[in-house]
Regions:
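Conserved N-terminal substructure of TIR/SEFIR domains
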Residues: 1-68, 91-98, 106, 138-162
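A generic structural signal for short coil/turn motifs at secondary-structure boundaries
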Residues: 18-19, 78-80, 133-134
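A short acidic (Asp/Glu
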Residues: 21-23, 81-83, 113-114
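Redox-cofactor binding/interface segments in oxidoreductases and associated redox assembly factors
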Residues: 71
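Conserved TIR/SEFIR loop-to-helix hotspot centered on a Trp-containing motif
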Residues: 75-96, 108
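Rossmann-like NAD(H)/NADP(H) cofactor-binding core
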Residues: 101
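Glycine-rich, charge-decorated loop segments at or immediately adjacent to ligand/cofactor-binding or catalytic sites
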Residues: 108-123
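Short secondary-structure boundary motifs at beta->alpha junctions and helix caps
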Residues: 124-141
Length: 162
């Protein structure tokens, strides 16, 4: 078997969404632990910035070192000035330099809310439902499993010529 491709995924999310993001990332880490093709490091500010470090500098370094973005889309994510000014431009718009995988974490209204450049991208949801719309642990685990499958396909496409 060929060596796994090692990738760092930058995970921008709103601080208030932390509990849901943690659950989803833990489930994804478990799925990717068994991947035949990829070894994934999920970079997120709450675990990768050490006490005493300058958070803006650390976030920008994590963003620069990342291969892709795993964007945790929610109303709070879209409302964040910091995400909008310092993180999203690397993934959408004229300054975009990195591929993205947008995930529907919490419901947003595609018609009524400003999606900050994400309106043209397929946002992952499970059968049209956002992650937090699923009530049982089993449904949330299934969301993570289906997201893992979609991510494997997207990562294979993005890294095909690398």
């Amino acid at each position: 078997m060929a060596d796994k491709k090692v990738l760092q995924l930058f995970v921008p999310h709103a601080v208030v969404d932390g509990v849901d993001v943690d659950f989803l990332l833990k489930a994804l880490e478990t799925q990717f632990a068994n991947s035949k093709r990829f070894e994934i490091d999920f970079w997120q500010c709450r675990k990768d910035i050490l006490v005493g470090e300058k958070w803006h500098d650390s976030i920008q370094a994590g963003l620069a070192a990342s291969d892709l973005g795993l964007l945790m889309v929610s109303p709070a994510f879209l409302a964040s000035d910091y995400i909008g000014k310092h993180e999203l431009p690397k993934f959408v718009g004229p300054e975009a330099t990195k591929p993205l995988i947008p995930v529907g974490l919490k419901p947003v209204d595609f018609q009524r809310q400003d999606l900050k450049g994400l309106k043209d991208f397929q946002i992952f949801r499970r059968e049209g439902k956002f992650f937090t719309e699923l009530s049982s642990r089993m449904q949330k685990e299934d969301f993570a499993y289906r997201l893992y499958q979609s991510m494997e396909d997207r990562l294979a496409a993005v890294t095909a010529n690398v």
